[in-house]
Amino acid sequence: MTPTLKAAAFAVLVAGAGSVSAFAPLTIVDQGSLAAGGTVIQNDGTYDNDAPTAAGQTFHGDHLYAFYQVPENARPLPLVLWHGAYQSGRSWETTSDGREGFQTLFLRRGFPVYVIDQPRRGRAGNSTVAASVEPTPYDQLFFDQFRFGRWPDYFPGVQVDQTARTLDQFFRSVTPNTGPYDPRVLADGVSALVDRVGPAVLVTHSQAGGPGWLTAIENANVKGIVALEPGSGFVFPEGEMPEEMPSAAGTLTPEAIPAADFDKLTRIPIVIYYGDNIPTEPTTERGKDNWRVRLAMARLWVEAVNRHGGDATLVHLPEIGITGNTHFLMSDLNSVQIADLIARFLGEKHLD
C-alpha cells in the first residue's frame, strides 16, 4: 500500500495554453501502474554481449498498460476504463476543456479505477507484428464521425465546448495503432488484467465494445459491462446472424460465435449508451449514417442477449430526454450527468 495521497486540491490540470483548474480534495490510498498480458518472442542463436545482434535476444510485446488508483473507503468492484479507436487512456482523464474526466468522477464515487492503454496503442506500443504509422490528415473526418457536427460547423445544442483551444486539445488526444488491430489480442490483454485484479466491471468506448464482449466470454472475473457507443464487433450466436447493414460509411457486418460462448454474455448485466444526432433513416451524411447502423445493430444485439435469458439494456439518450451528446459521452459537457446514469445502473445491478 502506498502512502495516502491528497490529490486535486492544488492539482494543476492543463486544458490548453494558460488554462488552470483546481478541484476539491480527493484521498487516494493506493496508486500505481503495470503491464498485463502480452507475449515474448525469442530469436534463435546466442546473444553476444560485446557484439550484439538480434541473435538470441527476446522481445516483449502485445501487453497492455494500466494506471490504477484506489480511493479511500473503496467499493469492492473496480472499473476498467477502456478507450476506443485512435485513443488512449487519456480519453478518461481530464476532458479537452479542462474538467474532471471519468477517471476522477468515478474515484469520487468510491470506485477503484484502472485506466488502460490497450495492446499496440499509447504506452503499450510494443507490437509483435509490424505496422507502419503514417502522418495521415484525418482531423475533419473525426470531427464528423464523432458527431461534433458537420465540419466546420457544430451541431446546434451539441454538448461540446466550441473554443478553438478545446478542439485543438481533442485533436491532440488522437494516437495511432502501432500494430494491426486484433480484437483477440486486446481481449487477452484485458483478461490478463482482470486475472490479476480480480472481479471487475468493464467500461468500454467505441471500438473497445467488441473486444469487451470477447473479454467477458474469456474471463468470468468480468462481472458487468458498460458500453459507450460500441462501434463494431457485435457477436451473435451461429445461426442467428442478422443481415449486414450498409451505410454511407461502409457496411457493418455482425460476427458469428458459438452459442456456448454467446451464452456467457447472458450471465452478466450489460448496458449500452448512445448519444444524439443519430438518424433513424439512411442519409448521405457519412458521419451520421455511420452511427445509424451501429445503433440499429446494437438494438438487435441487446434483443439477442435478452432472448437467450440475459440482462442487457440499450439507452438512446435522446429517448430519455438527454440531448446533444457526441460519440464521446464521457467527456461531453454533461459528463457528470452521464456518470450519474452509469452509477445508478451499477447500483441497481449490485455492481457497486
Can you say where each PLM-predicted feature lies in the sequence?
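Gly/Ala-rich beta-loop-alpha elbow adjacent to hydrolase catalytic centers
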Residues: 203-212
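Conserved acidic catalytic loop of the alpha/beta-hydrolase fold
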Residues: 180-201
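Conserved alpha/beta-hydrolase
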Residues: 99-125
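The feature captures the conserved acid-bearing segment of alpha/beta-hydrolase catalytic domains
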Residues: 232-308, 313
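N-terminal cap/lid segment of alpha/beta-hydrolase-fold proteins
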Residues: 23-74
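A conserved short beta-strand
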Residues: 220-235
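Catalytic active-site module of serine/aspartate enzymes centered on a nucleophile-bearing elbow/loop
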Residues: 324, 328-352
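Short beta-strand element of the alpha/beta-hydrolase
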Residues: 76-85
